[in-house]
Amino acid sequence: MTADAHLFSASDLEAATRIAEPDFELLDALIRTDDPDDQAHTLARVALSAFDNYYAVSRRIPALAKAAFYARDWPATVRLSKIRIGLYTACIDQLVPLLKAGLPELANDEQVWVRAEAELLAAIAGRYEADFAFAFWQSLRRKLVSDEWRPVSYDTGPAARPPAAIAAVVRTIAATLPIQPEVIRNVLDAAGFTGPWRDLDGDAALAAAAIEAALEPLSPRAGETAKIEIAESGFFRNRGACLVGRIRLRDRGDMPPRNIPLLVALLNEDDGLVVDAVLCDSDELQFAFSSTLANYHATNPRYHELARLLHELMPKRPLGTQYSCIGFHHLGKVAVMNEILTEHRRSKEKLATAPGFKGTVAIAFTMPCSAYVLKIIRDHPTDDYKFDYFDGLDAVLRKYNLVHEIDRAGSMLDNIIYSNVKLARTMFAPDLLDELLEAGIGTVTLERDALVFRHLIVQIKLTPLPLYLTTAAAADARAAVINLGDCIKNNAAADIFNKDLDGRNYGVSRIRKVYLFDYDAVEQLTEVKVRSTPPMPRAEDEDGVVFRPAQMLEGLRIDDPGLRRAFRDAHPELMQPDYWEGMQHALRAGKVPKVMNYPTSRRLRR
């Protein structure tokens, strides 16, 4: 294919991803019966039918994403990501009004819910996706009883599964060192990539050489045997695709067993498929699979085994976020909350105010041992708030949801928003408890021995950038400020502009990448007015968000002159209106930007 194609029209995609209507016969039977046992049985069937409708469409989307990748239909890849991320909620929202209208008393009938849950658990017993169906059931119930602010459990409960065995999703390929190009062909075949290729022989030779270089620190020997474990799945996202696995070297007597992770990144160019990069470093894989990017569509349906494999390849990244990065957000929500509760139970640590700077809009809190930061939005901003008008809690939550639903371009943290979640009062340090109840009256209530959160935001823990710059080695600090510029550019490519360009809104991860993590001040870049400096007469009276690029360095809180110079030298265009206006024009034209999610040094042809 020699040019970008449009395999799917908007109507084609809508038809292919449309959720079937609820089973109206079952709904009618549910509404008509007065027998509590019949009600419970039928309610379970109604919910399971809705879940099955949802699950069928969600499993269809990865194949559509693969087809769009092969057709080079980039707008379709973007639409599929948006469709998939909203599908779960759309399915719940399709059913809830019908149940509320037909059975308004259902929300208060605890006995029917208890019996119906037992019926549902019996119906899903033995199904692979039983835990997902149970999570769907909990979401449905929460939506129906939300007016009562009833807290729910995020435990997987009776639908829990035994630990996943990754052998179910990998193919093992035997090899003899040094790795030969023919082995790379087998690796690509195992993950389901078939071409047409631009230069498969050349790519295979370059990929084999890259793997050999990555193996060198493991002291390999010619003739030594290796096992390559490859996930039998393609992973598709926007303009790219990849396969993942690992290379194992066995105990050699003088050397213990050794292994390295493996990611092979593919592009589909005008003249065919290209192996673009090979990654064999866990931190680099973690960035490629980061929740700061759009989710991957994985063609293998065994999500537990895939998440477990990804966790083994990227152990610094919690298991819960591995589910989210392959599109299973609601299972990720369950796993993340369980991880937080387990961290507390094992460490006995209290949740306390997060290190760094006091938020003017959010209250952030964590445990020293935790991989996560929890947040609520204040009822009113603090006196240090920079802007004249505060849109309020619901508007801020909409911005956090906006970031969740877009391609975060590798530079914005994803966030999980829980509703009506209950946490034991004993989990909280006294000072934090007082602040939450005083500044979050619209969000937090105390019920006996627990706090109930109307909304609770959870993100991966970062080190605030200004704090990081005071403690990092000189080279790491310089790399961070340069990466900050990359972060701002990637945000712009995703049509996101942070009008509060303050370094305190950015953080550094465990793998030393910089991300935006506070979203109360984000706007769509296409709606921002980019202006030169000095302002024109009466320009300060302009409505909307006005941005003067020449002034951006002043707000970033990069105090060290050498670091400011490093930022300016690496990203001079960020201080020029032309750059921002050019990005706005591209976004308005509907262009899908290329976002690099691995180091340029890992590309096979640079």
UniProtKB/Swiss-Prot annotation:
The active site is at 414. Keywords: ATP-binding, Cytoplasm, Glyoxylate bypass, Hydrolase, Kinase, Nucleotide-binding, Protein phosphatase, Serine/threonine-protein kinase, Transferase, Tricarboxylic acid cycle. The keyword Kinase applies. One of its GO terms (biological process) is glucose metabolic process. Its EC number is 2.7.11.5, 3.1.3.-. ATP binds at residues 354-360, 375. GO terms for molecular function: [isocitrate dehydrogenase (NADP+)] kinase activity; AMP binding; ATP binding; phosphoprotein phosphatase activity; protein serine/threonine kinase activity. It catalyses: L-seryl-[isocitrate dehydrogenase] + ATP = O-phospho-L-seryl-[isocitrate dehydrogenase] + ADP + H(+). Its main location: cytoplasm. It is found in: Cytoplasm. One of its GO terms (cellular component) is cytoplasm. Transmembrane segments: none annotated. Belongs to the AceK family. NCBIfam families: PRK02946.1. Bifunctional enzyme which can phosphorylate or dephosphorylate isocitrate dehydrogenase (IDH) on a specific serine residue. This is a regulatory mechanism which enables bacteria to bypass the Krebs cycle via the glyoxylate shunt in response to the source of carbon. When bacteria are grown on glucose, IDH is fully active and unphosphorylated, but when grown on acetate or ethanol, the activity of IDH declines drastically concomitant with its phosphorylation. HAMAP family: AceK (MF_00747). This is Isocitrate dehydrogenase kinase/phosphatase. The gene is aceK.
